Amino acid sequence: MASYPYGQGYHGAAGQPPGAPQTNYYGGQQYGGGVQPAASYGRPAPGAPYGSPPSGGVYGHPVPGSAAPGAPGGPYGGQAPGGPYSVPGSTPYGSQQHGSYGQGAPAGNIPPGVDPEAFSWFQTVDTDHSGYISLKELKQALVNTNWSSFNDETCTMMMNMFDKSNSGRIDMFGFSALWRFIQQWRNLFQQYDRDRSGSINQGELHQALCQMGYQLSPQFVQIVMSRYAQRSAQPGLQLDRFIQICTQLQSMTEAFREKDTGQIGTAKLSYEDFITMTTTRLL
């Protein structure tokens, strides 16, 4: 499994399709920045949210101290009161704990390039005080709107993307990059959850992918929902699955673009090329 230090080495970085957040996460380097793909499977729709969320965020909660309007809001779970994104109680990620969230640490103790809120959360999530975040600690820290923990696949995917040292742990700089990555996805998730149910249904997912620029059929979206949505009377995707689907779709689209030399939406490749492509691009 490949490692993507702070998201810099992620395969989509050479030219991502619409869908993933484009934000400078660490050291001025852009996660997934680059040229746009051809119109056949990736040109952003007019007015699409690709690149940055709307000014002030969906619920008007920009990050305190953020440099510009439109930055993602606070940790997932700290949304506007009253709706499906309200916080029902305390949680490792999404509410105040031990006075950490919102208070931060003395400015002089925050390393350059580290988000102050991410720094504060790092102190809380690093339960063993090792100076690193393990997969277990990360999973314990992240929750969805329905109070479920992030699934193992999404947590492992994000660890692989932001683990600089291939040690299975994330340092403070990697965590700051990961924190911003999640906030951007959270903002998009809220934007596409048009009925404010706290989850993404099949119609919302199809609309989201279309507005991100992906030309995919309703049948494909149905397959995705049957694979990843919760089993219930009203199947829906929580934030963790939404991040997983969109990030993997971005990676696979970039792999296809490398074979689609004419940028026409079709490519010819051998069976081994196909297997290699799918194996190496799964995060």
UniProtKB/Swiss-Prot annotation:
SMART domains in UniProt: EFh
Locations listed in the record: Cytoplasm; Endoplasmic reticulum; Membrane; Cytoplasmic vesicle, COPII-coated vesicle membrane
Bias (Gly residues) ranges: 71-81
MF GO annotations: calcium ion binding; calcium-dependent protein binding; ubiquitin-like ligase-substrate adaptor activity
List of residues binding Ca(2+) 2: 193, 195, 197, 199, 204
Descriptive protein name: Peflin
GO biological process, one term: neural crest cell development
Function: Calcium-binding protein that acts as an adapter that bridges unrelated proteins or stabilizes weak protein-protein complexes in response to calcium. Acts as a negative regulator of ER-Golgi transport.
Sequence repeat start and end residues: 21-30, 36-44, 45-54, 55-62, 71-79, 80-87, 88-95, 96-104
GN (gene name): pef1
